[in-house]
């Protein structure tokens, strides 16, 4: 009985460690210039691919994207079609809503943080997104709605 309990506790710890290394969840983005928290993005899985949707903008809740129709940034998918590749998710795209430009995208975990890389060919840059443990969604993963760009 003691051995069975030990195996159960070890297995539970392994599953918990694996779950904490995932990318799915809520993440706080940081403004490159001011270094202040900017928005909350929900990273979610849909049909085996990873997507990211802005669920909150921390300063200007009515901010719009530089896209046809000027959609609000809140509710906008900014990451789409990422595929798992080892410990990373690659071959997707990311939208910069303020510029209306789309770049290649990869994401991966470094410790508790999420590293988001936007790139054109071999050139790119990384952003570090912080885990957001206070934002509560409705519990249902969204259905992707990739913006026209």
Model-found features: residue ranges?
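Sec/Tat signal peptide C-region and signal peptidase I cleavage site
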Residues: 13-20
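Positively charged n-region of N-terminal signal peptides that target proteins for export
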Residues: 1-5
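A short, sequence-level motif marking secondary-structure junctions
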Residues: 45, 58, 108-111, 130-135
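Cleavable N-terminal signal peptides
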Residues: 6-7, 17
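Edge beta-strand at a domain terminus
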Residues: 120-149
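Central antiparallel beta-sheet cores of small beta-barrel/beta-sandwich binding domains
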Residues: 28-103
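K/E-rich alpha-helical interaction surfaces of small helical-bundle regulatory domains
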Residues: 21-38, 127-134
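Surface-exposed interaction patches
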Residues: 90-93, 99-119, 124-128
């Amino acid at each position: 009985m003691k051995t069975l309990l030990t195996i159960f506790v070890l297995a539970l710890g392994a599953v918990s460690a694996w779950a904490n290394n995932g990318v799915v969840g809520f993440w706080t983005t940081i403004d490159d210039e001011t270094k202040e928290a900017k928005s909350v993005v929900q990273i979610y899985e849909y049909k085996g691919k990873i997507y990211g949707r802005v669920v909150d903008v921390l300063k200007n809740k009515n901010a719009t994207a530089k896209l046809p129709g000027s959609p609000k940034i809140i509710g906008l998918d900014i990451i789409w079609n990422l595929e798992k590749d080892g410990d990373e998710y690659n071959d997707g795209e990311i939208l910069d809503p303020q510029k209306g430009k789309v770049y290649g995208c990869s994401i991966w975990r470094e410790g508790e943080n999420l590293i988001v890389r936007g790139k054109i060919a071999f050139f790119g840059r990384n952003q570090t997104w912080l885990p957001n443990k206070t934002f509560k969604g409705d519990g249902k993963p969204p259905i992707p709605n990739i913006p026209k760009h």
